[in-house]
Curated annotation (Swiss-Prot):
Keyword Signal: yes
Cellular component per GO, a single term: extracellular region
InterPro entries: UPF0669
Protein name: UPF0669 protein v1g209471
Signal peptide as annotated in the record: 1-23
Record flagged with keyword Secreted: yes
Organism: Nematostella vectensis (Starlet sea anemone)
Length: 165
């Protein structure tokens, strides 16, 4: 009985993975560090639904987003995430561009180090312009382009790993 369902299940999982990989793509990943109580600002010009994933690797960095303010902070923002660890914010396609992005180093951490990943959802009907999307107005990390082929390869490895466990 098990073999009867394993092929359709694998095909369904593969199609689900393929859909997610083709509709969403990592635009850039970069690292940075920021002192307690300080902000690093970025500007997002790219159209479409964009998800920002801020992973604090040391200390605690928080994310503030605004469609109206170029330098959002903890009092002036439209979207924010201030959790300990991973902060995720999805910017709707309807938000006016340019978007102001602020990364705050939490006051309880003398130095916060972070990795920011920018993911675009091509399923929302956005333009196919693949130019760089940001400009740093203070300190920032070095951006790295992520290849679609690399993302597919990593996804396949994740599926194989999940099946083996």
């Amino acid at each position: 009985m098990q073999g009867r369902y394993s092929a359709p299940l694998f095909l369904l999982l593969w199609l689900f993975f393929l859909h997610g990989t083709l509709c969403e793509q990592v635009l850039q990943t970069f690292t940075g560090e920021i002192g307690a109580g300080n902000y690093t600002y970025f500007t997002l010009n790219r159209e479409g639904e964009i998800t920002l994933i801020l992973e604090s690797t040391e200390g605690d960095a928080d994310l503030y987003i605004s469609q109206n303010v170029a330098k959002p902070d903890y009092e002036n923002y439209d979207l924010q995430s201030s959790t300990c660890g991973q902060d995720v914010v999805t910017i709707p396609v309807e938000f006016k561009r340019p978007i102001g992005i602020g990364v705050l180093g939490h006051a309880n951490s003398p130095l916060s180090k972070y990795t920011m990943t920018v993911v675009v959802d091509y399923g929302t009907g956005m333009a196919e312009d693949k130019n760089r999307w940001y400009s740093a107005s203070e300190e920032g990390g070095e951006p790295q382009e992520e290849s679609l082929i690399w993302m597919i390869f990593v996804g396949i490895l994740k599926i194989i790993f999940e099946i083996l466990l």
